[in-house]
């Protein structure tokens, strides 16, 4: 991953971890992954600060099993969280069990879609606000409190965007007639109009990600934190979510670790 002379073993402080996960966002609909139509300035700039993985794949093209997989490190069938809308078996260990003994405060703010609580005993869970928005006040308070107490943290920020119904953001930013649609879509006016609303919600999600990064900056925790961006499975248009076509399991994955990960690097490693 392009590590510098400052290795993990040489660090005297435990790094913080912040993982931002989108919801139903095809990786190729981000600017840094090749989209010519999307507006994702925060994610694109973030990619210049870390390593962008080109071959990051999920275990399954569904939300709940993917999140169980992410938080437990287990294949969903093994944890019990398969198919969608199921939960892990009692007794399954999650990232919370592994990090809390090391002194970490572990929190999830945003979408959950995981269960039971005994498997995911987060120190803090804050659901989305009414309308599905992230609670940025809770994000800032959690980071600020950990900083004040000198406690390392692992924070999962789970956005609801750009999951349908695609009713957030400003679709007027996008000209339906000039969009470059993926070749597998049926190119009709209705598809183009729908796609503008999807892109608008991606832009909305990008702003959410930018807000989270700004909070890290405000709390002066950027240089002490590993930040990961994931796009989750593809959108709900054909040949993506729910399928094992590439768009269904291929995720955007970008990692920033100041002083450790080489800025602007690209990795073809399979992750």
Question: Which residue ranges define each predicted feature?
Answer:
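Formylglycine-dependent sulfatase
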Residues: 1-271
